[in-house]
């Protein structure tokens, strides 16, 4: 369902949140003028109930969309976009951290409700990982995959590239931020994987460069986040 509680405009409140990110001393302003964020916090509270209130249900689509876009706006501050440094002045904001934790704690509980934990406990972890590895190497031909391979036309391909460009044009791999720590063989292998994805230090060989070339061939905008509004909440998550 795309219905929302009467009087709450998630799209408008997302834009108000974006404006908050550019405030000087955001934490101080929230403390001194709490009414500034009352509507936003009320919308987040309502969205949390709509999206994650019942772990047995998929939740409200627009609520998911709103919450994931809020999280995206917060988390993107951890990456450098080669723009004005003033855009990062609130990257260490305690208020933003509180909002993120509030949303993610409810989201994680809802996600856990979608998983049969007892069944997972009975599985052989190593064998399960091997099975997942094999499935990644040789994925089954589902109805959706068959459509993409056999029936997708040029315009459909352009749409697919535009939607996935939110990820394809940006290097946001979590791997690059978890490789620190004691040296070990697993870390060494992960570094090899990371270097391959980053073109071994050559811009022309980076995966994002190849993706941009594919988009250019389809006459699409290659600006990072250029098609942000096309992205479904599942992609943001």
Regions found by a protein language model. Name each.
Residues 1-237:
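Non-heme di-metal
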């Amino acid at each position: 369902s795309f219905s929302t509680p009467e009087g709450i405009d998630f799209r408008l409140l997302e834009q108000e949140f974006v404006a908050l990110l550019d405030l000087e001393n955001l934490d101080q302003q929230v403390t001194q003028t709490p009414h500034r964020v009352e509507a936003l916090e009320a919308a987040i509270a309502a969205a949390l109930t709509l999206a994650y209130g019942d772990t047995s249900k998929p939740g409200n689509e627009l609520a998911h969309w709103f919450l994931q876009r809020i999280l995206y706006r917060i988390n993107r501050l951890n990456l450098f976009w080669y723009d004005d440094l003033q855009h990062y002045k609130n990257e260490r904001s305690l208020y933003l951290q509180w909002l993120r934790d509030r949303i993610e704690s409810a989201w994680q509980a809802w996600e856990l409700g979608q998983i049969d934990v007892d069944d997972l406990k009975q599985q052989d972890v190593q064998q399960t990982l091997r099975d997942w590895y094999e499935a990644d190497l040789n994925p089954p031909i589902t109805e959706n995959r068959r459509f993409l391979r056999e029936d997708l036309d040029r315009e459909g391909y352009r749409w697919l590239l535009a939607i996935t460009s939110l990820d394809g044009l940006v290097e946001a791999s979590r791997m690059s931020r978890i490789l620190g720590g004691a040296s070990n063989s697993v870390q060494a292998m992960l570094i090899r994987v990371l270097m391959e994805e980053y073109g071994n230090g050559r811009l022309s060989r980076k995966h994002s460069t190849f993706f941009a070339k594919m988009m250019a061939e389809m006459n699409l905008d290659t600006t990072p986040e250029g098609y942000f509004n096309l992205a479904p909440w599942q992609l943001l998550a």
